From Swiss-Prot:
A Pfam family reported for this protein in Swiss-Prot or TrEMBL: KH_1
HAMAP family referenced in this protein's UniProt entry, alphabetically: PNPase
Keyword Magnesium among record annotations: yes
InterPro entries according to UniProt: ExoRNase_PH_dom1 (IPR001247), ExoRNase_PH_dom2 (IPR015847), ExoRNase_PH_dom2_sf (IPR036345), KH_dom (IPR004087), KH_dom_type_1 (IPR004088), KH_dom_type_1_sf (IPR036612), NA-bd_OB-fold (IPR012340), PNPase (IPR012162)
Protein name in the entry: Polyribonucleotide nucleotidyltransferase
Occurrences of domain S1 motif (ranges): 627-695
Gene: pnp
Main localization, broad class: cytoplasm
Keywords for the protein's UniProt record, in alphabetical order: Cytoplasm, Magnesium, Metal-binding, Nucleotidyltransferase, RNA-binding, Transferase
Enzyme Commission number(s): 2.7.7.8
Function per UniProt: Involved in mRNA degradation. Catalyzes the phosphorolysis of single-stranded polyribonucleotides processively in the 3'- to 5'-direction.
Family to which this protein belongs: Belongs to the polyribonucleotide nucleotidyltransferase family.
Amino acid sequence: MTMFNTIKREFQYGNQQVVIETGRIARQANSILVHMGGVTVLVAAVVKSDAKEGQNFFPLTVNYQEKMYAAGKIPGAYGKREGRASESETLTSRLIDRPIRPLFPEGYVNEIQITATVVSSDKTQSADIAALIGASAALAISDAPFNGPVAAARVGFINGEYVLNPTLEELKESDLDLVVAGTKSAVLMVESEAAELSEDQMLGAVLYGHQQQQIVIDNIASMAAEIGTAKQQYTAPVRNQTLETGMKEQFGTQVSDAYTITDKQARYSKLDEIKDAALAALAGDAESESYADTVSELKEIYNDLKYRTVRDNILSGKPRIDGRDLETVRALDVQVGVLPFTHGSALFTRGETQALVTTTLGNTRDVNMIDSLAGTIRDHFMLHYNFPHFSVGETGREGIPKRREIGHGRLARRGVQAMLPDSDRFPYVIRVVSEITESNGSSSMASVCGASLALMDAGVPIKAPVAGIAMGLVKEGERFAVLSDILGDEDHLGDMDFKVAGSKDGITALQMDIKIEGITPDIMEQALKQAHAGRIHILDAMNKVLPESRTEINAHAPNYAVIEINPDKIRDVIGKGGATIRQLTEETGAVIDIDDAGTIRIFGENKAATKAAIAKIEAITAEVEVGKTYEGTVARIVDFGAFINVLPNTDGLVHISQIADERVENVSDYLKEGQIVKVLVQDVDNRGRIKLTMKGIEQS
C-alpha cells in the first residue's frame, strides 16, 4: 500500500509540458506541486475554518519566494540564506493576489495564507505563471468558497506573432511582455510592458492569452471535482432593512449633495459629518448591548449608500464627483527644472494628484546588482515610488516601501523603460524617484508623466515623451460607463482599474484589475480608445513645456567620455595589482572602467576631471611615432648606449654612436641616469624595439 494518494493532471501549455499534482508533499495544507517546463513550484494554501472575533476585512496573504537552491546557487546575503523578499518576489506576490482576491464572496473574512515556493528552476523562464496556476489549484481543492479556478498566461509578440509563455531569451526579442489572468468566462487582471504597440495589438494579446489558458482552467476544475472537497458554507449577513431604509430616506439626499463638492478634503469632511449625524439618529440607545453591532452595521450601510450614490449618478448621466463628464481629464500643470541642484526634475499636477519627480545620473559603479535564479542582473535603470501619508492629509509611520509602493513604482517603470536609450549609447545608470506630494487617484500614472519630463530635463535622450492615464468603469447589468482619469473615490467605487501609459505612437504599459465578471472585449476596446484620447491630451500639455530631451546633460551630472586604446596597453593603465588605475582615480576623482577590447569609459565629476583622466590615460598608452622628437629621462646606462624613457612604460635605446656628432668613448661622459634629454625616434622594429638618436638635436 502506497504512503501517498497522489492525484495528477498533465497537459501541454504552449511549448511547456505542465504537471499539476497533489497528495505527495505538504499534505497538512492544501498543496499543489506545479511542474511547468523547467520550473517547479510548491504552493500551499491554508484556510481557516472560522473568522477571528471582530474581523472586518478579508485577511488574504500571498507570499511568493524563490529559493536559491532551486537553481543550484548559494545566496550571497549575510548568513548565506534567503532573507527579506526581493522586489521581484514582492511583485509576483501581488501578481498572484490580484486575480484571486475578487473571487471570494463579499463579506468573507476567514484568514487565508498562500505560500508559493520555487524549488527547482532551469533558469530559462519565469516561475510566476506556474505559481499563479498553483495558487488557483490549491484554492480549488480547498474548502474555501473560491469562485475559481483562475489561470494565467504570459504573452509575447515576436515578429508580428503572439507567443504563448515565451522563455526569458525569447522575451529579449519580444515587443511585449504581458501576463493575463482570468476565469473560464472573464479576464480579471492584465500586467504588461510593450514597445509602443497599438491598442488593437494589446487587446488582441489579452484575448489570445485568455483563450489559451482555458486548458489550465479545465484541468484544475477536473482535479478539484475528483478530490471533491466540500466547500465552507458562507452566507453574507442579511442587512437590517429598517436601518437601510432609514439611512437612505433621511440621509440619501445629503450624501448625493456631498458628492457635488469638488474639493476632496471638503467633500470628505462633509461625508464624515453626515455619517456622524446618521449614527446619532439611527444607532439607538448607546447603553444597549446591541449598540456596538448596530453602529458597525450602520457604517457598512452608509458606505454602501455612498457606493450606490456615486454609481447611480454616473450611470444616469450626471456629472462625476468633481463635475467632469466621462472623458474629460482633470486640469493639468507641468513644470520642469524645479529643483536646481538635481540632475533633472519635474512637478506634474493633475487635479488633486501631484508628483515631484527627479532623475539622477550615475556612473557604472552605481548599477543595481540583483541576485536572481537566472543569475546576477545588472540593472541600469531604477524607478522608485514613494507615497507618504501627508499626500492624502493623513498621519502615519514612515518606513520601508510597502507592496503597493513597490507595485506602483514597477508600473511607472514599465511605462517609461521602452523609451530609454540603449546603454551602449547612453551608459549612465539612471535613477528616477517619484515623490507623491498629493494624491486623489492615478498617482502611478502621474509618476509616468513626471518621470518622462524629469528624464528629458536631465538630458536623457529618450525616444519620445510618455504619459499615463487611469481609466475606470461602472457597470450595472447592460448599462456601463467608462471613466477617463479617475479619482480615488471612483477607483474605490468602480468595477475596473485600467491604467495605460504610452507615447503618441503606442502603448508602453498596461495594467488592468477587474472586480466583476462580464467585462466584454467591446468594453475593453472602448476603454483603450478613450485612454488613447486622454493620453494624447496629456502629452500635448507636456510638450508645450518640454517637447524633447535637452541637448546636453545637466551640468551637475557626471561628465562622460569614452576612448579606445590598444588592448596591449590595458595592463599599463591598470598597473601592478591595480596600482596605476587607483592612482588615476585618486588624482582625478574620475571613475574609470576598462573592458577587454580596450574601450575605456570615464565618468568625471565635471568636464575638467574627465579631461584630466583622459590626458593621463593617453600619456600612459601613447605609442612613439617615428620621426618625432621626445623629451625623455635617462633610465639606464650600458656600455653600448643608454635607455631613455620617452613615454610611460616605454623605453628606447640611444646607441653609443647616436649620442653625439663626435665619437663617444664612454657613455657616462655624456649622460647620467635621471638626466633629461631630447631624442628623435629613428625606427621601431617588428619586435617593438625603439631606436633613438641625439645627433643633430639641440639639448636644453
